[in-house]
């Protein structure tokens, strides 16, 4: 210790100058010659000097001279190790630590330590050492090793010596004997940290140079290049890391590869920045609004995800928001409209009911099936060129995207009815069935066909979600009361079923009767029962061929449907598809059977509760209309029920041969 303190005043002065860049810049030129001389002296004496006060003095002098020549902030790797040991292991105060570094002020020591911890000294491998796990006895010899390192002719020689010096380093004297040899026997004497501030002083010079070396444990400082300060000047890139980048984490051992260390330092170094970005991410969230405005934001979000976490979070927002935007802005209706392109394109013009399209979202699959059938039948109807009904949309308002203007042809309405028949989409009938809204002809046609489908009121309520079972029952009763006129005579213009049903093919007089019956049907009036009585049997016979066609199509549709969707054959007599579903369906004959009979289900009805409800409602709400045979409406509910049951049973039997069975049924009913 006394030896280290015996450094000449000039060397001390120079070392102190090193700590101050300005002073150093002022004094650097005058001392350059002296520093070179001191270096030469150190080199000359290095091979022969024993571990003695003279050797330590020369080493310290050379170190101090180097300090003067080097950046004032330069530290010897051994000084760095000692500094870290004193601060991190012994938890000493900066003022006490500065005593081990006579040329360093407490602030200089603190600044150096911060730079080491921050990873800003990327090239300095002492920063890579985990001082807590450092095995070599940290001794003030680090400064000595610095001198040795300074005397090393080249990095390569030093690197070769590093491993050898490691063991020696632990025992090296506090002030290394200036020698280029890798082994530093002189160091062994004072390897113990004498911890005199003077011992470390010379070491401060070599800190950066040591870092450039693959810094094996403490031995590396001894192996540092002869002119570490030159090395620093020639390798400015070693300080590419920004200060504070690694200040928070230094756990790597000194043995760790500097490259690996630098990578880790970079990772750690970015952590504070990442935190900064994360703090900004709070501002990034408001940006989601802008992102949501652009549906293409999901693409940008992918780009953002590749970047930092704040952008990733922002990208997540943009992704979700864009999805929400598409769903919110265009509304579910648009997506539903887009689903069946062909159908939606056909009905783009008909958006009057589009505001209610959301109701159709639930059954998109079924609707798609409906739309397929609907498209086919629409084409067929367009080819047939049936008369147009200004009142009925092809689809109820629930199929808003499918709705046609009221000016749409009856064929379109019948097509709607067919599409409805093809599936259990209660949405199609729902809007039209609202009691507040007059029953649409589509709904009436559906109910009329339900007579043949033998659908229960519950099933009808599913088909007509906007209508309650009571309403449907009432309407069925009304239609059944008017069925005589409605089923055969209901003009295609008035009802979709007319168009789809063979009834459409009836004579003009029959259609006239049907028109009147339509009006009366809505009113629940049965004044045209006689006309229907006249029409039904013949009309049934006429429709037999048509009904077979529709029944086959309807049966196909029913097979497609996930649930036993009621197949609404355009023909009132179309019972083929109804046969399979008759058990669960209310026997609804579009024929003269009263609405009560219509509400009545087949004896094998799967829903006895529905049957009871229908019977009660029928008995309470409406007197069943007489069949065409009876001009009076006084036919009892039981009679109509029996007739309907018979007709339904015959219908079931007639699924295979719908025409003769229907005719027979009507004859029986008449």
Curated annotation (Swiss-Prot):
The modification Phosphothreonine is found at residue 489. It comes from the Eukaryota. SMART domains: SANT. Residues 1-44, 425-436, 599-608 have a biased composition (Polar residues). One of its GO terms (cellular component) is Rpd3L-Expanded complex. The keyword Nucleus applies. Residues 226-242 have a biased composition (Basic residues). InterPro entries: Homeodomain-like_sf (IPR009057), Myb_dom (IPR017930), SANT/Myb (IPR001005). Gene3D superfamilies: Homeodomain-like. Keywords: DNA-binding, Nucleus, Phosphoprotein, Transcription, Transcription regulation. GO terms for biological process: rDNA heterochromatin formation; regulation of transcription by RNA polymerase II; subtelomeric heterochromatin formation. It is found in: Nucleus. Residues 94-117 bind DNA. Residues 1-78, 226-250, 293-332, 406-436, 483-659 are annotated as: Disordered. Residues 45-74, 295-307, 316-332, 544-561, 587-598, 622-659 have a biased composition (Low complexity). Its main location: nucleus. GO terms for molecular function: sequence-specific DNA binding. The modification Phosphoserine is found at residues 245, 247, 487, 491. Residues 67-121 form the HTH myb-type domain. It holds the Pfam family Myb_DNA-bind_6. Component of the RPD3C(L) complex composed of at least ASH1, CTI6, DEP1, DOT6, PHO23, RPD3, RXT2, RXT3, SAP30, SDS3, SIN3, TOD6; UME1 and UME6. Component of the RPD3 histone deacetylase complex RPD3C(L) responsible for the deacetylation of lysine residues on the N-terminal part of the core histones (H2A, H2B, H3 and H4). Histone deacetylation gives a tag for epigenetic repression and plays an important role in transcriptional regulation, cell cycle progression and developmental events. DOT6 binds to sequences containing the core CGATG, which resembles the PAC (Polymerase A and C) motif. Belongs to the DOT6 family. This is Transcriptional regulatory protein DOT6. It comes from Saccharomyces cerevisiae (strain ATCC 204508 / S288c) (Baker's yeast). The lineage of its organism: Eukaryota, Fungi, Dikarya, Ascomycota, Saccharomycotina. The gene is DOT6.
């Amino acid at each position: 210790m006394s030896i280290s303190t015996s450094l000449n005043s000039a060397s001390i002065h120079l070392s102190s100058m090193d700590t101050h860049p300005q002073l150093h810049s002022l004094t650097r030129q005058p001392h350059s010659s002296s520093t070179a001389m001191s270096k030469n002296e150190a080199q000359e004496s290095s091979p022969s000097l024993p571990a003695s006060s003279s050797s330590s003095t020369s080493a310290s002098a050379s170190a101090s001279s180097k300090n003067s020549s080097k950046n004032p902030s330069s530290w010897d790797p051994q000084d760095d190790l000692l500094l870290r040991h004193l601060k991190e292991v012994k938890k000493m105060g900066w003022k006490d630590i500065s005593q081990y570094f006579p040329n360093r002020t407490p602030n200089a020591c603190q600044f150096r330590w911060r730079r080491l911890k921050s990873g800003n000294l990327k090239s300095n491998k002492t920063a890579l050492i985990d001082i807590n796990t450092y095995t070599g006895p940290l001794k003030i010899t680090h400064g000595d090793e610095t001198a040795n390192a300074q005397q090393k002719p080249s990095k390569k020689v030093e690197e070769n010596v590093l491993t050898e010096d490691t063991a020696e380093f632990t025992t090296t004297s506090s002030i290394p004997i200036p020698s280029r040899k890798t082994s530093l026997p002189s160091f062994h004497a004072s390897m113990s940290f004498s911890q005199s501030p003077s011992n470390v002083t010379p070491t401060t010079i070599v800190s950066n140079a040591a870092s450039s070396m693959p810094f094996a444990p403490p031995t590396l400082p001894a192996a540092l290049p002869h002119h570490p300060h030159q090395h620093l000047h020639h390798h400015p890139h070693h300080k590419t890391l920004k200060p504070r980048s690694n200040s928070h984490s230094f756990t790597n051992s000194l043995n760790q590869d500097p490259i690996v260390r630098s990578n880790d330092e970079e990772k750690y170094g970015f952590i504070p920045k990442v935190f900064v970005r994360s703090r900004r991410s709070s501002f990034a969230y408001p940006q989601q609004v802008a992102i949501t405005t652009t549906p293409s934001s999901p693409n940008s979000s992918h780009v953002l995800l590749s970047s930092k976490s704040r952008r990733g979070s922002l990208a997540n927002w943009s992704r979700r928001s864009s999805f929400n935007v598409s769903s919110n802005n265009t509304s579910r209706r648009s997506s539903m409209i887009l689903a069946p392109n062909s159908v939606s394109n056909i009905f783009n013009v008909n958006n009057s009911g589009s505001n209610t399209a959301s109701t159709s979202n639930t059954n998109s699959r079924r609707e798609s099936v409906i739309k397929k059938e609907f498209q086919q039948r629409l084409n067929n109807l367009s080819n047939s060129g049936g008369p147009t009904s200004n009142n009925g949309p092809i689809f109820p308002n629930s199929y808003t995207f499918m709705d046609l203007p009221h000016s749409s042809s009856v064929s379109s309405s019948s097509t709607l009815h067919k599409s409805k028949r093809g599936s259990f989409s209660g949405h199609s009938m729902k809007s039209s069935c609202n009691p507040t809204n007059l029953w649409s002809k589509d709904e009436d046609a559906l109910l009329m066909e339900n007579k043949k489908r033998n659908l229960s009121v519950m099933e009808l309520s599913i088909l007509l979600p906007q209508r309650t079972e009571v309403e449907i029952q009432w309407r069925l009763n009304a239609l059944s009361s008017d069925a005589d006129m409605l089923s055969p005579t209901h003009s295609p213009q008035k009802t979709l079923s007319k168009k789809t049903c063979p009834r459409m093919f009836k004579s003009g007089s029959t259609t006239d009767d049907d028109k009147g019956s339509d009006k009366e049907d809505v009113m629940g009036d049965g004044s045209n029962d006689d006309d229907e009585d006249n029409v039904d049997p013949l009309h049934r016979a006429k429709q037999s061929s048509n009904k077979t066609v529709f029944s086959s199509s309807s049966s196909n549709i029913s097979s497609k449907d996930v649930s036993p969707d009621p197949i609404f054959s355009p023909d009132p007599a179309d019972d083929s598809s109804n046969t399979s579903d008759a058990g669960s369906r209310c026997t609804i004959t579009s024929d003269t059977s009263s609405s009560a009979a219509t509400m009545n289900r087949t004896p094998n009805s799967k829903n006895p509760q529905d049957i009871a409800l229908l019977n009660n409602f029928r008995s309470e709400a409406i007197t069943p209309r007489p069949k065409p045979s009876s001009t009076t409406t006084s036919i009892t509910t039981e009679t109509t029920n029996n007739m309907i049951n018979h007709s339904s049973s015959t219908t079931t039997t007639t699924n295979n041969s719908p025409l003769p069975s229907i005719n027979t049924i009507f004859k029986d009913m008449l």
